[in-house]
Amino acid sequence: MPNLTANGISLAYEDHGDPSAPPILMIMGLGGQLSLWPDKLVADFVAGGYRVITFDNRDIGLSHQHTDERTPKIVPQIILRRFGIKLKTPYTLRDMADDTIGLIDALKLDHVHIVGISMGGMIGQHVCALVPDKVRSFTGIMTTTGNPKLPRPDSHVMKAMIKRGTPPTGREAIIDASVDMFAIIGTPGEDHHTNGMRERIARSYDRNHSPASTARQMAAIASAGDFRDFTRRITAPTLVLHGSADPLVPIEGGQDIASIVPGARMETIEGMGHDVSDRFMPELTAHMLEHFNAHS
C-alpha cells in the first residue's frame, strides 16, 4: 500500500480504477481506516467510470501517528464543548482538511468529487470552503455542521460511548466490542456481525488497532465547535445523504447543511442509522453516481 507526504506528514492511500477517469476522494469518519469503506461501494464507483481514492486520515491506520501526543479523555472533551470552552488538541479538523488538500496536490489532481462520511463530511466541508476550485462536487453522508442548536446524540449512545470499565483485550473481544458499538449507533435491526461490518472491522484491527488515535480524533471534532462559517463558503454542487434513524448524528445535522449550501440536495434514507448498511447500498450508490454524473 503506498504512502505519500501531504501537509508535512505521511498518509496511506489506495487508488482504484482508471487513472484517467474522474477522481472521487473518499474521506473516512472518526476512528475509521480506509478499510472500513465497503468494497462493493468502491467497486460500484469504479464500474460507473470513476477513479476512487481512499486514504487513512492522520493518526489512524497506516498514516502518521501522533503517538508522542497526550491522549485527551473523552468525557471532559464532551463537557467542555457543551460549555463552549476551547480545547487544547494535538490537531484540528482544519489540519485534517489541509492533509486532504495536500493529498489532492500530491496526486496532481486538478478536480475531485469529495465524499465524506460523518467526521469525514466535516473535513470535506472545510476542504470545499478552502479550495473551491479543486472540488467538482461534495457528498456529505451522516454528517453535520457543529451548530450548537442542533439535537445531540441519543442518550443511550452517549452512555455507551463514555461508559467506564475494563477495556476488552484480545483480538476477538476487541472486534466484538467494536461491532457491538455499531449495533448501538447503526441501522436498527441489522446484524452487524453478519452483514459485512465485522469483516471490515477485523481488517482494520489487523492493519493497526489504536484506540488512542480515535480519542485524539474525537478531540479534534470537539475543538471544532460550530464551523458553519466553512459550510457557508461551499460553492460545489452538494448532495446530503442522511439516515432517518441515525442516533449519533441526528438527521437535523444533514438538514442544516442542506439549508445552508445554495442548491444542495437532501436525500433522507428511511430507516438507516449511523452506518453504511448493505440494505441501503443500492440506494446510496444510485444517489451518488447520479450526483457525480451530473457534475463531471
What residue ranges belong to the model's regions?
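Catalytic active-site module of serine/aspartate enzymes centered on a nucleophile-bearing elbow/loop
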Residues: 264-296
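Conserved hydrolase catalytic core segment
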Residues: 110-149
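Flexible "cap/lid" loop of the alpha/beta hydrolase fold
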Residues: 138-168
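Acidic catalytic loop of the alpha/beta-hydrolase fold
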Residues: 245-249
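Short beta-strand/loop motif that positions the catalytic acidic residue
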Residues: 234, 240-242
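Conserved acidic catalytic loop of the alpha/beta-hydrolase fold
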Residues: 82, 90, 94-112
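Conserved HGGG/HGGXW glycine-rich cap/lid loop of the alpha/beta-hydrolase fold
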Residues: 9-83
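Conserved alpha/beta-hydrolase catalytic His-Asp/Glu region
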Residues: 172-215
